[in-house]
């Protein structure tokens, strides 16, 4: 697959990117080089290679997922314009 100037203009139009004719002419060989590298990757023999999610092992250092009350009710209610009995107070909207 190769990219020509018309393809670059169409992609730029779809992406809503303004490009000059000089930019288009500079992008054509760059995009063709990138596509060439991608084609080379397609030729690599990966039989017997286990799929990886990351190159280095990732160990998630997360806390246990435990349900708590948050213990910050008073701090949250301090930001409310009006609170009653530990809850947000809002105007009555049902008639």
Curated annotation (Swiss-Prot):
It comes from the Bacteria. Its EC number is 6.3.5.-. InterPro entries: Asp/Glu-ADT_sf_sub_c, GatC. It catalyses: L-glutamyl-tRNA(Gln) + L-glutamine + ATP + H2O = L-glutaminyl-tRNA(Gln) + L-glutamate + ADP + phosphate + H(+); L-aspartyl-tRNA(Asn) + L-glutamine + ATP + H2O = L-asparaginyl-tRNA(Asn) + L-glutamate + ADP + phosphate + 2 H(+). Keywords: ATP-binding, Ligase, Nucleotide-binding, Protein biosynthesis. It is an enzyme of class 6 (ligase). One of its GO terms (molecular function) is glutaminyl-tRNA synthase (glutamine-hydrolyzing) activity. Allows the formation of correctly charged Asn-tRNA(Asn) or Gln-tRNA(Gln) through the transamidation of misacylated Asp-tRNA(Asn) or Glu-tRNA(Gln) in organisms which lack either or both of asparaginyl-tRNA or glutaminyl-tRNA synthetases. The reaction takes place in the presence of glutamine and ATP through an activated phospho-Asp-tRNA(Asn) or phospho-Glu-tRNA(Gln). NCBIfam families: gatC. Belongs to the GatC family. Heterotrimer of A, B and C subunits. This is Aspartyl/glutamyl-tRNA(Asn/Gln) amidotransferase subunit C. It comes from Rhizorhabdus wittichii (strain DSM 6014 / CCUG 31198 / JCM 15750 / NBRC 105917 / EY 4224 / RW1) (Sphingomonas wittichii).
